Amino acid sequence: MLTAAQRLRRSTDFAAAVRGGRRVGRGVVVVHLNVPGIPPEASAKPARAGVEETLAPARAGFVVSKAVGNAVVRNRVRRRLRHLVRERLTGLPAGSTLVVRALPAAAHGSTQRLGADLDAAIAAARAQRGRRSR
């Protein structure tokens, strides 16, 4: 289970991640990853000794539409994704926002396939951070 600080709840948080993040689809999932940049004024300030900065943890949210299946199937897919993301959330930079959207084929996919597709999508989204498309 994700902690309360790690979950996306408000629609504005989901919208910000989807609109501002990188979108990558792999297999049965589509990942929207938004990694905040470091503001230029933050890097110019020297760090104070003995003061540890508290950064917001990486947060995740899930979108599983009715196209995936009935409520039982959707909740099963959501539980699997939540378990898989919990293990991978610590590898994301602090302050990141991750939205995982399950495609209809996720209802029939195994947990191993969901995990492999999720890993591939997150890796591709992180690799795209330096590139600009268009």
From Swiss-Prot:
Keywords carried by this UniProt record: Endonuclease, Hydrolase, Nuclease, RNA-binding, tRNA processing
Biological process, per Gene Ontology: tRNA 5'-leader removal
PROSITE patterns: RIBONUCLEASE_P
Catalytic activity: Endonucleolytic cleavage of RNA, removing 5'-extranucleotides from tRNA precursor
GO CC, alphabetical: ribonuclease P complex
Coiled-coil stretches: none
Superkingdom, natural source: Bacteria
Pfam families: Ribonuclease_P
Enzyme Commission no: 3.1.26.5
Molecular function in Gene Ontology: 3'-tRNA processing endoribonuclease activity; ribonuclease P activity; tRNA binding
Entry's family note: Belongs to the RnpA family.
HAMAP family linked to this entry: RNase_P
Function: RNaseP catalyzes the removal of the 5'-leader sequence from pre-tRNA to produce the mature 5'-terminus. It can also cleave other RNA substrates such as 4.5S RNA. The protein component plays an auxiliary but essential role in vivo by binding to the 5'-leader sequence and broadening the substrate specificity of the ribozyme.
Complexes and interactors: Consists of a catalytic RNA component (M1 or rnpB) and a protein subunit.
Official protein name in the record: Ribonuclease P protein component
Naturally occurring in which organism (per UniProt): Salinispora arenicola (strain CNS-205)
Lineage start: Bacteria, Bacillati, Actinomycetota, Actinomycetes, Micromonosporales
